[in-house]
Amino acid sequence: MPGSAAKGSELSERIESFVETLKRGGGPRSSEEMARETLGLLRQIITDHRWSNAGELMELIRREGRRMTAAQPSETTVGNMVRRVLKIIREEYGRLHGRSDESDQQESLHKLLTSGGLNEDFSFHYAQLQSNIIEAINELLVELEGTMENIAAQALEHIHSNEVIMTIGFSRTVEAFLKEAARKRKFHVIVAECAPFCQGHEMAVNLSKAGIETTVMTDAAIFAVMSRVNKVIIGTKTILANGALRAVTGTHTLALAAKHHSTPLIVCAPMFKLSPQFPNEEDSFHKFVAPEEVLPFTEGDILEKVSVHCPVFDYVPPELITLFISNIGGNAPSYIYRLMSELYHPDDHVL
């Protein structure tokens, strides 16, 4: 069929283009845009490819998911969306297969820890399965669109008048959170510049345009200023399975200073950043870029004698974090295991 062949080639081109974008580092896109694009591609794969049952579809999604995640292992949002879709397929198949889902809501910790992957049979064919899965993915896309607004809506519960708030670098979620609070409260924001990328300057400009009193400082001054700070509010790239963070370089320093001064550290992050990965998975955790910002190529004499590494991310252990604020509310780091079980199936943690 020429129509289906054209659809197939168009889909292949879209996937290839997305994979190439990931290989180049994702470009200027935010994690939310990456999540939406991944879901859009997976939805098209489900619609355009031929498959007869849930087992075949899951294998297809896994194969394409592995290809996408291998292109840029540090972009964990892509893998998270693949796992969400796999969980949707399992749930929709289970409903059609007559398996009740109600018991899942009341599982105990013991059950969560001891339940292995049940050898379910996904070979039955259901005509409704595709439309049900597409509908569930569309609902997830709608949920993604409202994540930032849902997080920002909780701002007034956490930020009070005349407080001094500290943040680091640039985060769209934190920016929206602070701007929402500024509509009714007056407070002062101190932004650590996040060298060598200095994204904190962009954050400071955006906040000052919104009428928020803002000060930019160097990362070296974090500890000296922390005694004046009431709260630290940061964003993150990934929330790891143990409740830790993979956040911009300098965040660990900020978190340690906050812990020393007993300053609450709040992390604003939507649920699609929650990943079942652990910090020992080096390929996906570390990301290094050219160290030109730290040591310019003009310093030729020194360059011959030293080896310079410029990591993009810091590891922030869960004991330094006070609270996570997501689009579904506030949670302690110790509750991450529960959220993980609701979002992803244990068999899908490794694609």
From Swiss-Prot:
Pfam families: IF-2B. The keyword Cytoplasm applies. GO terms for molecular function: ATP binding; GTP binding; guanyl-nucleotide exchange factor activity; translation initiation factor activity. It is found in: Cytoplasm, Cytosol. Keywords: Cytoplasm, Disease variant, Initiation factor, Leukodystrophy, Protein biosynthesis. InterPro entries: eIF2B_beta_subunit, IF-2B-related, IF_2B-like_C, NagB/RpiA_transferase-like. GO terms for biological process: central nervous system development; cytoplasmic translational initiation; myelination; oligodendrocyte development; ovarian follicle development; regulation of translational initiation; response to glucose; response to heat. One of its GO terms (cellular component) is cytosol. Activated by the chemical integrated stress response (ISR) inhibitor ISRIB which stimulates guanine nucleotide exchange factor activity for both phosphorylated and unphosphorylated eIF2. The keyword Transferase does not apply. PANTHER family: TRANSLATION INITIATION FACTOR EIF-2B SUBUNIT BETA. Component of the translation initiation factor 2B (eIF2B) complex which is a heterodecamer of two sets of five different subunits: alpha, beta, gamma, delta and epsilon. Subunits alpha, beta and delta comprise a regulatory subcomplex and subunits epsilon and gamma comprise a catalytic subcomplex. Within the complex, the hexameric regulatory complex resides at the center, with the two heterodimeric catalytic subcomplexes bound on opposite sides. Acts as a component of the translation initiation factor 2B (eIF2B) complex, which catalyzes the exchange of GDP for GTP on eukaryotic initiation factor 2 (eIF2) gamma subunit. Its guanine nucleotide exchange factor activity is repressed when bound to eIF2 complex phosphorylated on the alpha subunit, thereby limiting the amount of methionyl-initiator methionine tRNA available to the ribosome and consequently global translation is repressed. It is linked to Leukoencephalopathy with vanishing white matter 2: An autosomal recessive brain disease characterized by neurological features including progressive cerebellar ataxia, spasticity, and cognitive deficits. Brain imaging shows abnormal white matter that vanishes over time and is replaced by cerebrospinal fluid. Disease severity ranges from fatal infantile forms to adult forms without neurological deterioration. The disease is progressive with, in most individuals, additional episodes of rapid deterioration following febrile infections or minor head trauma. Belongs to the eIF-2B alpha/beta/delta subunits family. This is Translation initiation factor eIF2B subunit beta.
